[in-house]
């Protein structure tokens, strides 16, 4: 069974939730109205007016009215997709029925919002049969309101062991004539309720990192042609921790992440994009340290590594408690083992264009050279290494460019900021390479 993606977007970077009604405010929809005005890199790829956890139970009826009002009036201008979250629970028929009623009212064509609604987010799902119940409600709503069958997309939040196991069944269930699960869009982790469902405990009370769940969600999305999104990172002041979480996620194939604030939206929108400039990393003190570019050289300015040139033409490299006496070739090999390069957008595009030209000329593989002059304690060492590029290497390098192209296609409101970030020429080349 081959995987066919049924959605235009291949990537989602940001999943931003907003309360639908705030109690005690003169305008209970003020946070919705504010979110609906976001543009450019401050606007998420997916905006989620949240009528579940982010909104108090006694405000949810008003929240439905606010969703209709704000989306009807601001939805046409909003640059991302709009997917309200409604109430649902795998163990509560009454809650599921409330969610159905909320969706039915929001999508009523007479209310003027449905033309700007891309789908809905269903929380607290259980096994695959529960997913089918939600899908059936979507189909009933579409039939009731004269909408095209399958036109409303469905995303779920994985918040239980049942839902985690259900992802393994999804690939086989999608496309069966008895359901419309091809409407599926996002698989979103909900680590808070997942932790509760798993009865997990930590000494500090903080959430476990759940790398297994994130891997399983990414795998489930890949197998079914969907998009995986990580859950909320609730320490909103810990920007570096948020970046590290996203970096770890991307290594698992999970590009998207929940954003709780406009500041997190900007971070999550920019983090997956190729960097503007390349950088060299040097392993020192058990971690990778980014070197400082100075006059075309890469300078290490730390205390965990020292280098001295001795009189016989050799070198002494001290790393932690180790003292290594090396000749020039041995030093070069040692430093090559300790260094890595993060390519810039320009580097990736240059390499892809070079490989495309070589392939056009009949070559199946070519060598790409990376070279730098390292400076440690004032001692300069030239290093270089060749990396073979074949079709597999090319396709792996293409992923960040495919992401950029997907963003450029679906988020024209970000074109100006992307041109400012990279330069108009490299943006033009990046949108053309690989096509």
UniProtKB/Swiss-Prot annotation:
Family annotation (InterPro entries): Aldolase/citrate-lyase_domain, Malate_Synthase-like_Aldolase, Pyrv/PenolPyrv_kinase-like_dom, Pyrv_kinase-like_dom_sf
Calcium found in the keyword field: yes
Domain of life: Archaea
Pfam families for this protein: HpcH_HpaI
Entry's Gene Ontology molecular function annotations: hydrolase activity; magnesium ion binding; malyl-CoA lyase activity
Record: residues binding Mg(2+): 159, 180
Residues that coordinate or bind substrate: 159
EC assignment: 3.1.2.30, 4.1.3.24
Cofactor note: Divalent cations. Mg(2+) and to a lesser extent, Mn(2+), Co(2+) and Ca(2+).
Catalysed transformations (reactions): (S)-malyl-CoA = glyoxylate + acetyl-CoA; (S)-malyl-CoA + H2O = (S)-malate + CoA + H(+)
Cofactor(s) named in the record: Mg(2+); Mn(2+); Co(2+); Ca(2+)
UniProt keyword list: Calcium, Cobalt, Hydrolase, Lyase, Magnesium, Manganese, Metal-binding
An individual GO BP term: oxaloacetate metabolic process
NCBIfam families, per database record: malate_syn_AceB_Halo
Similarity comment: Belongs to the HpcH/HpaI aldolase family.
Function: Involved in the methylaspartate cycle. Catalyzes the biosynthesis of malate in two steps. In the first reaction acetyl-CoA is condensed reversibly with glyoxylate to form (S)-malyl-CoA. In the second reaction (S)-malyl-CoA is hydrolyzed to malate and CoA. It can also catalyze the condensation of propionyl-CoA with glyoxylate and of acetyl-CoA with pyruvate, however the CoA-ester hydrolysis reaction is highly specific for (S)-malyl-CoA.
Protein name: Apparent malate synthase
């Amino acid at each position: 069974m081959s995987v066919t993606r049924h959605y235009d977007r291949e990537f989602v970077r940001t999943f931003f939730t907003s309360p639908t009604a705030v109690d005690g405010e003169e305008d209970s929809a003020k946070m919705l109205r504010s979110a609906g005005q976001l543009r450019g890199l401050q606007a998420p790829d997916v905006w989620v007016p949240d009528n579940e956890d982010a909104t108090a139970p006694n405000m949810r009826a008003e929240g439905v009215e606010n969703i209709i009002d704000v989306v009807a009036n601001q939805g046409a201008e909003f640059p991302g997709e709009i997917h309200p979250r409604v109430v649902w629970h795998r163990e509560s028929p009454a809650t599921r029925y409330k969610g159905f009623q909320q969706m039915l009212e929001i999508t009523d064509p007479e209310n003027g919002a449905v033309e700007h609604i891309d789908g809905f987010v269903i929380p607290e799902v259980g096994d695959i049969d529960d997913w089918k119940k939600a899908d059936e409600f979507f189909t009933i709503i579409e039939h009731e309101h004269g909408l095209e069958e399958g036109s409303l997309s469905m995303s779920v939040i994985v918040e239980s062991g049942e839902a985690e196991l259900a992802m393994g069944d999804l690939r086989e269930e999608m496309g069966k004539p008895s359901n419309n699960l091809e409407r599926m869009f996002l698989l979103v982790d909900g680590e808070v309720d997942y932790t509760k469902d798993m009865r997990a405990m930590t000494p500090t009370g903080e959430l476990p990192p759940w790398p297994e769940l994130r891997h399983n969600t990414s795998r489930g999305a890949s197998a079914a042609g969907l998009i995986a999104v990580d859950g909320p990172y609730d320490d909103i002041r810990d920007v570096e921790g948020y970046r590290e979480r996203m970096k770890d996620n991307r290594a698992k194939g999970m590009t998207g992440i929940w954003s709780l604030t406009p500041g997190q939206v900007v971070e999550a929108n920019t983090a997956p994009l190729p960097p503007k400039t390349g950088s060299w990393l040097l392993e020192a003190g058990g971690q990778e340290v980014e070197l400082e570019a100075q006059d075309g050289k890469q300078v290490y300015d730390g205390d965990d590594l020292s280098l001295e040139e001795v009189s016989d033409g050799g070198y002494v490299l001290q790393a932690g408690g180790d003292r290594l006496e090396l000749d020039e070739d041995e030093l070069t090999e040692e430093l090559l083992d300790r260094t890595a390069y993060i390519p810039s957008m320009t580097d990736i595009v240059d390499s892809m264009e070079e490989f495309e030209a070589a392939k056009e000329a009949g070559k199946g593989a070519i060598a790409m050279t990376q070279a730098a002059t390292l400076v440690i304690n004032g001692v300069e060492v030239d290093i270089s290494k060749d990396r073979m590029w074949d079709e597999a290497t090319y396709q792996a390098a293409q992923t960040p460019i495919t992401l950029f192209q997907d963003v450029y296609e679906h988020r024209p409101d970000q074109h100006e900021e992307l041109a400012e970030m990279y330069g108009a020429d490299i943006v033009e080349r990046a949108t053309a390479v690989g096509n």
